[in-house]
Amino acid sequence: MANIRREKGLNGTIAIPGDKSISHRAVMFGAIAEGTTKVSNFLLGEDCLSTIACFRKLGVKIDQSGNDVTIYGKGLTGLQEPKEVLDVGNSGTTIRLMLGILANVPFHCTIIGDDSIGKRPMKRVTDPLREMNAQIDGREDGQYTPLSIRGGNIKGIHYDSPVASAQVKSAILLAGLKGEGVTTVTEPLQSRDHTERMLRAFGCTVEVTGQTVSLRGGQSLIGTEIEVPGDISSAAFFLVAGAIVPNSKIVLKNVGLNPTRTGIIDVLQKMGAILSVDHVRNEEFEPCGDITIETSKLQGIEIGGSLIPRLIDEIPIIALLATQATGTTVIKDAEELKVKETNRIDTVVQELKKLGVKIEATSDGMIIYGNQKLQGGIVDSHGDHRIGMMLAIASCIADGEVEIQRSDAVSVSYPNFFDQLASL
């Protein structure tokens, strides 16, 4: 539980912790690569630590010293049948991408997670993997955990994904690494492309044409060095705080600027935020840079279409941003929010209403009315890290103290979030 009341502006410089998506992939790809992989600025959140724990159970030696991680790759054929179940905790990325990897290995695994994972849909991954010859079972015919999988003898497929999901795309591509022939995934909209970028960094040939990605089976990954940029989804909370808390100016260092993830920057700029991006670097792998944001006069906008996959995780904090804009903001085409750690359409609306916000849920998003004053109150993260952090930023503009129940959920992706907020 956290009790927050803020009566002054937010000013200072913050180094954003490592990107969660990239940290997951660095460990997974390093585990199935040949040779050693060294990862710096690894995110020490609970989700990424679950990935390390699972691959250790698969026989991979992984050393960790602070934010530096060394993975001694086994190659895909070197993974070992685990003696116990693989527990992914709260991590949807871990379970879905790991299913793709395990589709290649001829042994049995059982995968479980926490209560939240037990409610999240898995057939979007298990169905295409079954088409590729993986043997998968689970509750409701593989829709929910626990799941069991036995892989081997994978064949490439051309899969037209009904959803723009990097997790679905990645699972299929990873299954195709040792598959027979070519594996191709086409999405309705482009999702984040960290898997494609990292496969190339590990020496794999990946072809990308528009929203279609393909690779030929039989390729091996070669260990490498990965420097993880800061997570723009974590930075988003401080970007919004800087824009809406009076008398604020925040500099965020080393923020990932992958074009498939920068929807939050586009939204802030369209709403009129005073924002600058400097010192862009590392563009050949994962671009990153420094972002400065300050208190701004904002205008409500409509958010939807191809922008949604580029900011799906930032929608809770964008909803808060919209409460301080002039006019109405409409978020649409965001049905995917319903199958996140919580139904984020419902939880965002429910919790912001407790702070006096006028906001409406729709079937695929929400309508947020602007120029609102927030009041203090008791709110709940629902065990969802992004809801918890959004509510913490909301407390900075509330008239009165805000008590956040289950605030420890933020440790999933941002263990030192409250410390950094207090430092400003």
Swiss-Prot record:
Gene Ontology molecular-function annotations: 3-phosphoshikimate 1-carboxyvinyltransferase activity
Taxonomic superkingdom: Bacteria
Entry similarity comment: Belongs to the EPSP synthase family.
Function as written in the Swiss-Prot or TrEMBL entry: Catalyzes the transfer of the enolpyruvyl moiety of phosphoenolpyruvate (PEP) to the 5-hydroxyl of shikimate-3-phosphate (S3P) to produce enolpyruvyl shikimate-3-phosphate and inorganic phosphate.
Predominant cellular place of this UniProt entry's protein: cytoplasm
Enzyme class: transferase
Pfam families the record matches: EPSP_synthase
Protein name in the entry: 3-phosphoshikimate 1-carboxyvinyltransferase
Subcellular location, record wording: Cytoplasm
Active site: 313
Binding site for phosphoenolpyruvate: 20, 92, 120, 167, 344, 386
Catalytic activity, EC: 2.5.1.19
